[in-house]
Amino acid sequence: MFAPSLAAFRAMALPIPRLAPVMKSVQPASFPVLGSMAARLSTARGGRGLRAGRRPPGGPKGAAAAEEMAVPIGAALQDPNVGMAPVNDDLEIIEEVMKEDGFQPDPPPPGSPHDPPKLIPRGLGVPVGRRDPPRDPPRLIITEQPKKTGMRFRYECEGRSAGSILGESSTEASKTLPAIELLNCQAIPEVQVTACLVWKDWPHRVHPHGLVGKDCSNGLCQVRLQPHANPRHSFSNLGIQCVKKKEIEAAIEKKLQLGIDPFKAGSLKNHQEVDMNVVRICFQASYRDGSGRTRQLSPVLSEPIFDKKSTNTSELRICRMNKESGPCTGGEELYLLCDKVQKEDIAVVFRKEPWEARADFSQADVHRQGAIVLRTPPYRCVQLSEPVQVEVFLQRLTDRARSRGCPYTYLPRERDAYGVKVKRKRGMPDLLEELSGADPYGIEAKRRKPPPGFMDHFAPLPAADEAFALLADPLDPLSHLPPPSTPQILWGRSYFRTPPPTETPTPPTASWGPICSQGTSEGGGGRTSPRYRPPPPLKWGSQWAPPHQ
């Protein structure tokens, strides 16, 4: 205890008008100095009117009059001189008490009556100022979280050819890495940071998978940092190596023997509960203090990292859609190509804030986990006056993960959905309108006519025409006549349906013409008579046959 002075009260920024009530409430037994000051102050308040120029009468009536004349502290007064009188009186009384009682012995504490009393200095020796705030303890923070998706866990037999874990803010143009920072560690010469893999959920047991890459061994990554030089560190070439199911127990026991258990969760007998497709990175820092003891900082967990090859946790992505627009009434058949998905754990959502609807398809419409055949849902308002663009994305039902959206446009409903008016107009053309139009001869229509298709370039098969060409036409009036005897007449009449050959073969003339032979005449004169031999018969589809000998 010490005896406070007026300067001490001013240093404490305690308002003087409020000092008297505080001193009145002080127990004299606990604080003798303040108690005596409070007693003298209350006694002197009866004579305040004397100093203010107002002397009350003596006796009990004078005491009552003095109490009536006493002005409460803090009350509003019309005369400022009268209002300052109580404050000045209090200051004078406090100064008198402080002068009389400069030092007071501190009463001995209870339980030790034989200890000598100690003298304490006056309030003038009390240091004025604020104490320095306590320093914040050292801690570790993650400045760049690892990317949740896009990383495929590799087996040991695959080697270390996979890419490293990227940062959360990585893009195609710029790549970032997971990073940490040590805070309030400038006075520590060296800090060791250990990174390991743990479960996604509480109690964050040690995961059987391990870290591989730079500064990694036994599934752990350990680096030594000097906070006074550089408190930040980025983890480059850091990958995740998965183990087989039969090696889960051995991998966990090996890490526990190395003392890797940040949350003291221990091992688990039933290792089937381990989620092999998702992990977290746990960062823990340790250092040695001045006495040589090892201090551990609180472990820090990263965001979950999902295996890319797992359909339950992989990144969803729409590759292509066969249509980009459709009627606002819905029901349009749409083909959607995507990455590998689970048919029982996927949905296709159409959204435009605040509206959202799912497409209609069943598990049988998911083909080989990579294609979905669906029907579009109707838009919230089918009475559209202009096209409305919405967003289409995939959504996993278990963890509510979503893919990037693809644009889809809802078109206004057609007034003539079945084309009745178009058909009526096509059946009854208006000739006057066509002749008086901009293209009366149909030249522009011919120009706009689509080019012939692929099948239009093929000619009909000639086998059928050749087969029917030799048959007589029942409608031909000359079909009963025999064919002409000479080739010139034969080809000139166009008897056959097929065109004549370019070069007509000339029959040999040696076998044609009259042949003179010896014979008897009718008159018996023994003269020879010429006998004409007809040409050989003509075979259709071939050249002229040689004559019979």
Swiss-Prot record:
Keyword Nucleus applies: yes
InterPro entries given in the database record: Ig-like_fold (IPR013783), Ig_E-set (IPR014756), IPT_dom (IPR002909), IPT_NFkappaB (IPR033926), NFkB/Dor (IPR000451), p53-like_TF_DNA-bd_sf (IPR008967), RelB_RHD_N (IPR030496), RelB_transact (IPR032400)
Gene Ontology cellular component annotations, sorted alphabetically: cytoplasm; nucleus
Species: Gallus gallus (Chicken)
Signal peptide (from-to): none
PANTHER family: NUCLEAR FACTOR NF-KAPPA-B PROTEIN, TRANSCRIPTION FACTOR RELB
Entry's Gene Ontology BP terms: canonical NF-kappaB signal transduction; inflammatory response; innate immune response; non-canonical NF-kappaB signal transduction; positive regulation of transcription by RNA polymerase II; response to cytokine; rhythmic process
Pro residues bias locations: 105-114, 498-508
Name of the encoding gene: RELB
Localization annotation: Nucleus
Family matches, as Pfam families: RelB_transactiv (PF16181), RHD_dimer (PF16179), RHD_DNA_bind (PF00554)
Domain RHD: 135-412
Protein name: Transcription factor RelB homolog
Function: NF-kappa-B is a pleiotropic transcription factor which is present in almost all cell types and is involved in many biological processed such as inflammation, immunity, differentiation, cell growth, tumorigenesis and apoptosis. NF-kappa-B is a homo- or heterodimeric complex formed by the Rel-like domain-containing proteins RELA/p65, RELB, NFKB1/p105, NFKB1/p50, REL and NFKB2/p52. The dimers bind at kappa-B sites in the DNA of their target genes and the individual dimers have distinct preferences for different kappa-B sites that they can bind with distinguishable affinity and specificity.
